[in-house]
Amino acid sequence: KPKTLTLEGLGGLTIGQPVPANSSFTAGDGQIGNGCETLSSPEWPGVYAIRTNGEVRRISVADGSGVKLVEGIGPGSTIEDVRAEFPSFREEPHKYTGPGGKYLTQPGDEPRLRFEINPDGKVSIIHVGVMPELGYVEGCA
């Protein structure tokens, strides 16, 4: 399977669409019950998705997923790589990691990319999706 994250989606999941009937992505236990669910799949380690009101709204890829963007950037890439490839992205301080951690977010309203950067300057998670879910800091919150 190609492990390439696009603005459209990944692994049969499409931003703005329901999860396909044959998908291995399912909602696990311990959901908050606010109409938002976190989905994962045994076939896609290190990947999770957010579904709100029946639609996939965000897909996130972390270390161990083996997933990259077409540009070759993935978890473990450097903030310099991200800035060079995506110079227009907005930078904000990370909510949890302390100094040096950042979010780099693609401007606009359509499905967009958002990078979480650790204080060591490496990409920890790449998200694709739409606001407000794209900006959620922990799962459905």
Located regions from the model:
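N-terminal low-complexity, Pro/Thr/Ser-rich intrinsically disordered segments
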Residues: 1-20
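Mature extracytoplasmic domains of secretory-pathway proteins
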Residues: 67-85
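Mid-length scaffold segments of soluble, non-membrane domains
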Residues: 54-55, 59-62, 71-75
